[in-house]
């Protein structure tokens, strides 16, 4: 049985991926700093997890490991008074450090990148050869890590970067700051859908289980050509305008109203729905993505989920968990607000290291 180390194993994706891999005959070891370990929506998998900062991974942690799936990182921005360099530079440094250790030990390395590196895509579909135009420190960080991996690649080390589309779907540690999840949760609990933008920006979307499927394919794929393999993960059918996602949600939650935050800022008094990257109702991030390469590269790969099916599944999950507006608005399910809460209450340093021992953390 192949042993796989998953960094960021207690996050939104990691909490699904670890169980998925274990159900597909892999032995999983989790490695997570624990920022979101208490952000529980449903019962997470009982994966063996080491609660440590990814900056502290050493060669001993990689003993007996076949592949590292590197999910760990900071998943939202901007961070109020926190300096972007202090937040994101360490994630680039430790991604490169872990990759270097994998190279030395002959371990496969799979990096969780993002389609957000494309930023502004123009009228056509962007693919892996299209110029990257990252619009945020988060997406720039993803691109920089890819560049570092490309520089490390040689005949002894052939890493893989999976550029995930915007994720959606249920997770034991669900995020409600992802567009489809947010709109579905909002409609279910409040009877309203509030859009940050005018709804016209395009977004590629991918279900969390299809992300897991792509990771499994990457682990099994025989890639030894001495280069970084970059693959977009998703399906063209899930390239949707935000307004179309809202309509898919309305179809599953009949009677919910559609409103626009730019027309009435009072709609989001808690500041949870507001996307700080959207200014005056205008979101410059808009792109549609081609996923032809992953289908060509991984034999038999295709996405099983579309957005309407994912919304239907989420609504069923919300009913099963008795999701309320109070739970939906809890900061635990919004990465930016959760991190800022930990920082402002002196649990974290400016470079996002724990300041308190394990027994005093949330």
Question: Which residues are covered by each model-predicted region?
Answer:
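N-terminal Rossmann NAD(P)H-binding glycine-rich loop of SDR-like oxidoreductase domains
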Residues: 4-23
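Active-site Tyr-X1-5-Lys
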Residues: 120, 133-160, 188-189
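Conserved Rossmann-fold NAD(P)-dependent oxidoreductase catalytic core, especially the SDR/UDP-sugar
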Residues: 96-137
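Conserved beta-loop-beta element that borders a ligand/cofactor-binding pocket
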Residues: 114, 146-171, 181
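Glycine-rich NAD(P)-binding loop of the Rossmann-fold in SDR/ketoreductase-type enzymes
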Residues: 82, 86-97, 132, 136, ...
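SDR active-site strand-loop-helix element
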Residues: 7, 31, 68-71, 109-115, ...
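C-terminal substrate-binding subdomain of Rossmann-fold SDR/epimerase-dehydratase oxidoreductases
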Residues: 191, 196-362
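NAD(P)H-binding glycine-rich loop region in Rossmannoid oxidoreductase-like domains
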Residues: 54-90, 101-103
């Amino acid at each position: 049985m192949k042993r796989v180390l998953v960094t960021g194993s207690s996050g939104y994706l990691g909490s699904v991926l670890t169980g998925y891999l274990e159900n597909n005959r892999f032995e999983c070891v989790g490695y997570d700093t624990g920022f979101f370990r208490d952000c529980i929506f449903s019962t997470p998998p009982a994966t063996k997890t080491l609660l440590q900062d990814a900056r502290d991974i050493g060669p001993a942690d990689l003993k007996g490991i076949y592949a590292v799936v590197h999910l760990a990182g900071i998943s939202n921005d901007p961070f109020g008074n926190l300096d972007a360099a202090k937040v994101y530079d360490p994630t680039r440094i430790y991604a490169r450090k872990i990759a270097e250790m994998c190279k030395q030990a002959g371990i496969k390395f799979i990096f969780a990148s993002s389609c957000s590196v494309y930023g502004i895509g123009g009228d056509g579909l962007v693919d892996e050869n299209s110029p990257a135009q990252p619009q945020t420190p988060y997406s720039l960080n993803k691109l920089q890590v890819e560049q570092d991996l490309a520089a490390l690649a040689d005949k002894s080390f052939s890493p893989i970067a999976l550029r995930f589309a915007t994720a959606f779907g249920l997770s034991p540690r669900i995020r409600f700051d992802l567009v489809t999840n947010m709109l579905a949760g909002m409609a279910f609990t409040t009877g309203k859908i509030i859009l940050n933008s005018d709804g016209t920006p395009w977004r590629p979307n991918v279900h969390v289980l299809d992300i897991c499927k792509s990771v499994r394919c990457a682990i099994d794929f025989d890639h030894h050509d001495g280069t970084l393999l970059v693959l977009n993960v998703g399906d063209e059918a899930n390239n949707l305008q935000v307004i179309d996602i809202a309509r898919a949600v309305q179809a599953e939650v009949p009677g919910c109203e559609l409103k626009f935050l730019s027309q009435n800022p009072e709609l989001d008094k808690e500041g949870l729905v507001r996307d700080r990257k959207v200014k005056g109702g205008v979101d410059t991030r808009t792109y549609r993505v081609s996923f032809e390469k992953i289908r060509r590269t991984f034999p038999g790969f295709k996405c099983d989920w579309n957005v309407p099916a994912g919304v239907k599944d989420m609504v069923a999950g919300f009913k099963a968990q008795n999701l309320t507006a109070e739970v939906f608005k809890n900061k635990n399910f919004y990465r930016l607000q959760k991190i800022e809460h930990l920082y402002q209450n002196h649990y974290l340093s400016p470079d996002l290291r724990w300041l308190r021992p394990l027994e005093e953390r949330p």
